[in-house]
């Protein structure tokens, strides 16, 4: 019931709720329409898929004629109709069903938002009504109470009037602005919904109208072909066929024994008689049985035909483009306990074991295709010759990986059959896939499980780092091997879905193996890579190791080995080992028995790949050069005594033909000796050790340089302190320190250049793989350089003494060695000592600074005499500094040029 405020009746305050209910009804109707569309599309799609299965399962009619052509047209038109229906349903789902579901969801969200706004508006309106009610009730209470104060009555009356005015204002605002705003938005939503539903209904009619039109067209085409059937012609052709069968046979004739035997008797006569009987029976062709020329009876309804076909299957090595059941039937006698095809196990294990077990780490495996000629050669060996032992040049990762993909893709039926193709693509987890997995054939289940385990191992992180084949790449590559889409229109659309399914299979390998365990009969361990696959240089399977002998050119030498006839007799049944001059198989015959010469040949019938590798042949003795025959035999026996047997003696035979000298044991190897893998590894290790030693030497030199720099800094600090303590004008010592530091830097640069030259020489030596010649130290050059240095020191000392004498300063010895070894010399003597080796010194060169630098770097006794020299030369240095300040740069440059003329000592490596 509506409430009252005085005589006024309050509204229900539920306008927005009523409008929202109407919108909700429209949304529910839209949902009902969408569900109808979805269910109709599902029914039509299932019906079309069932028609497709029916068309595929229907065989071709055996008899040709109008009826057969008409029926083929009906089947083909039905198949086209089903394909058209499936494409129409998929297009309708993309254009109508999926967008309509999203539209309804969005519409409900907006309606919910506006409903919340309406509820908030109703709460505000209710608060206004409640305030008006409370003010009116207070006013009535004050009026009815006679004891109430007049002032309070007037105050309550004014409040009541104000509340009435505010409530009226809010009420007008509510009906004019707030409620119409929400109503307009809700009306807009309803308008959009109605227009959207109208559009979808039109699309529904348009799409589904094309389905009966296509069906009517197919029925019309079939009807025209049925009307064109000429039954008279078909009946006439059948009658003619029957007439051709009623042909008279030749009459039987009496054959006497003499004519049968042909006068010769024996086997020849029996053979001719047998042939005549066969010819008679072959002419008769009684029933469905007849006899071929080779004597085999062919009967389409007899068990002999089935048994002969089984024998043909067993003798046929083909494993490509045939059903899995036929492959398993072929290998049952050889591998009775193997659950999957041997070709699959072989290729997978070759990929794992090639490149020393690093095959799965090969970059771009299964993505980079193998060479077409190599893949075809491998396929021909397996498919035509039944040979599972390949030549050395075909043991490569990419051709074998391509062969594995080719075998999977050439199977008549995919691993996941077409009847579960669509359902399997809808799987979102491995558990959903296992539901369909259990309905697959047992052989398909085991192959899928085995491949999933191999691919799971392939996408492990340690393999992906180098192979660059992660889970997505592997799933993309192997999706066509697991699944095949019959519809050309949906191949590109289902690429991502197929890849997702293969990823689920690879990741769920453990669950698949629990559902479908595999028995491999320990085949993995029996598959071995031949020894020649690891060595590229020595890729031949059989080699001849013989002794080298030199004979005259007029005679030919043939080495005959005992027991060769026995080997030749066994060659048809067992594979021959590599023939050598001295082998264990040849030591059984007596040593004195002569035997013919044997030419080593490469053996073709190698053992199967799944057998364990045989032990390597015994090594031959070292070659013999120009040794008498008795000594050769004695040396061979001594070399082979450790092997536990005595080899037969060598026998030489002379031939009359003039042939060039023969050297046995010379193989077609290159002229340069080929290093083995171990020797190459040792050389690499030696090079690495040399590089490490060089790096250590560099670090030690850097540490020494740092220590020298620290010492120099300490010396500089000490010189600064000494110069500040004595006098501020001691510039000669600072110049000497500067020159000494420059000289040290020059020496360090020279050392670095020498080291760089040595490094370049080492690199050249390593590049040419030639042993470098050891440099011979030249003693005369060392003596000559020492003499030049001594002369230079003497010249500097003499020049210093002359300059001090000219200035009137007392002379003081620079070093004890110079004072004892070099007395005072005249200027003419100085010139004579300078002229042969160096140009004469200029008059302005500073001898004091250069002598101090040389003495400081040559011996520790010179540094101890610095203080005495400074005390003696302090009064003179002040005057020299004032006179020679403009010439300081010339002096330093002259001394540097003089020092640069001294040749460096020869480098020794």
From Swiss-Prot:
The lineage's top-level taxon is Eukaryota
One GO term describing the cellular component: cytoplasm
Positions in coiled-coil regions: 672-809
User: Which residues lie in Low complexity bias regions?
Assistant: 533-562, 571-602, 723-741, 786-828, 843-892
Q: Where is this region: Disordered?
A: 529-909
According to its UniProt entry, one GO biological process term is: signal transduction
**Residue numbers marked as site, Arginine finger:** 367
User: Where, per UniProt, does this protein localize?
Assistant: Cytoplasm; Contractile vacuole
| Stated role | Rho GTPase-activating protein involved in the signal transduction pathway.
The entry's protein name is GTPase activating protein homolog 4
Can you name the source organism? Answer: Dictyostelium discoideum (Social amoeba)
Q: What is the lineage of its organism?
A: Eukaryota, Amoebozoa, Evosea, Eumycetozoa, Dictyostelia
